[in-house]
Amino acid sequence: MRYLIGIDMGTTNVKALLFDEQGNTAGEARCPSPITLLPDGGGVFDPEELWRLCCRLLTELLDAAPAEARSRLAGLAVTGMGEAGVPLDAAGRPLYPVIAWFDPRTEQYPAWWRDTFGEDRLYAVTGLKNQHIFTANKLLWLKEHEPQVFGEMRRWHCIPDYIAFRLTGASAMDLSLATRTLLLDAASGTWSRELLAHAGIPADILPPAVPSGTKVGEAVSYTHLRAHE
């Protein structure tokens, strides 16, 4: 019997679940998400705190798991909140707190897209009616209000693929999350150079968009997880 781990990086809770190939639960660990709520109704997360919490939950999960499960782990998948993400520098270090998906600081940008690009064209490319929550609007906010961070950024990861990156060293984004960036060409499933150029966002900061279930790399060892609790 092989075992699998699922991680859910949620806005309210972070959860790790161990289960067998028949879908039977063999273990669970959870903890409230470390969000800092702001007076204006926004919120932020510390990327390093999210990573440490993930390591702690995985350690708790595996410490309590049967020895058979620990020796027969076949895979690990990460899901979680959409739209929010982490700007990383050339060394893969976080440059700025995670802006929560619901944070209102980006409310001005749907009007910018409407006036400079057009709602109909935006919908034709992305399949989305623009809202302030989408990732592209967070990148526009960083470009306008944190130009040094924007200039030093070499990669943008949404939260689930940031955790996958920390676990594996591999850079990729699930297509379902990529659709929530407002930067994906929905017809081709690739990043829209038209939208990126219009927004002044470098195309190479976005990781490859891959289908759910794609193997992106090998996860770190149990010992490595314990060292990062």
Predicted segments with their positions:
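N-terminal glycine/serine-rich phosphate-binding loop of ATP-dependent small-molecule kinases
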Residues: 1-96, 124, 152
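Glycine-rich phosphate-binding loop plus the immediately following alpha-helix
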Residues: 102-141, 186-189, 194-197
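Beta-strand segments within the central parallel beta-sheet cores of soluble alpha/beta enzyme folds
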Residues: 75, 154-158, 194, 205-212
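Polyanionic/metal-chelating signatures
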Residues: 142, 163
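Generic secondary-structure signature for well-ordered alpha-helical cores
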Residues: 59, 63, 115, 144-151, ...
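Conserved small/polar residues in nucleotide/adenosyl-binding loops
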Residues: 223-229
